């Protein structure tokens, strides 16, 4: 006598891990966690993210888009993908709007000095701005008063309450 039976698919959750990097850094190797793999099944995940080495400070969604198994078992799973967040810390300069954005991973009060250099490397101008940085919030500083020329370069220095200068640009 035959007895009918049904084998249900296992539920599998693949979650992109939240990650941090600094502005102007190479794209990190995204990581994931999985919950629900059965037996010796293993997998690898493919991600998409808008972040590139030239991206601005801020947050970007890390999206797991697909997965591959070491054996042909993908059809045995109901797969749910969970996005993660890439936080890009540091500072960036927007030439068009003449603003500097600073994205910090901790709360702190700082004095921000934006120093501009002419194309030949001579000092062109300095602007000081006091900032109360909040963790994971973007602060924007208007530096249009520096009259930065197209080929000038800038460096941004932060001085915290301990008077420790930190250069946060290349």
Stretches found by the model and what they are:
Residues 111-117, 155-157:
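Beta-strand signatures of extracellular beta-sandwich domains
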Residues 53-56, 145-150:
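Surface-exposed, short loops/turns at beta-strand junctions within beta-sandwich domains
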Residues 99-101, 137-146:
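Exposed aromatic-hydrophobic patches
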Residues 148-160:
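Short, surface-exposed ligand- or partner-binding patches at beta-edge/loop junctions that are enriched
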Residues 1-91, 106-107, 118, 131:
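Solvent-exposed beta-strand/loop surfaces, strongest in extracytoplasmic domains of secreted
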Residues 160-168:
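Short acidic/polar inter-strand loop motif in beta-rich domains
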Residues 124-135:
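Solvent-exposed serine/threonine-rich low-complexity stretches and specific carbohydrate-binding patches
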Residues 28, 96-100:
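Structural beta-strand segments of beta-rich domains
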């Amino acid at each position: 006598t035959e007895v009918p039976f049904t084998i249900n698919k296992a539920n599998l959750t693949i979650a992109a891990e939240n990650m941090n990097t600094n502005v102007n850094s190479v794209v990190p190797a995204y990581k994931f966690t999985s919950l629900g793999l059965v037996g010796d099944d293993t997998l690898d995940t493919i991600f998409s993210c808008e972040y590139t080495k030239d991206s601005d400070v801020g947050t970007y969604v890390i999206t797991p888009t697909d997965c591959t198994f070491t054996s042909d078992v993908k059809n045995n799973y109901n797969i749910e993908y969970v996005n993660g967040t890439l936080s890009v810390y540091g500072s960036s300069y927007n030439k068009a709007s003449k603003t500097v954005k600073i994205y910090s991973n901790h709360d702190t009060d700082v004095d921000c000095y934006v120093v501009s250099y002419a194309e030949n490397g001579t000092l062109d101008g300095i602007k000081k701005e006091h900032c109360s940085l909040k963790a994971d919030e973007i602060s924007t500083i208007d530096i249009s008063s520096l009259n930065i020329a197209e080929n000038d370069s800038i460096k941004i220095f932060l001085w915290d309450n301990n008077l420790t200068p930190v250069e946060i640009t290349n």
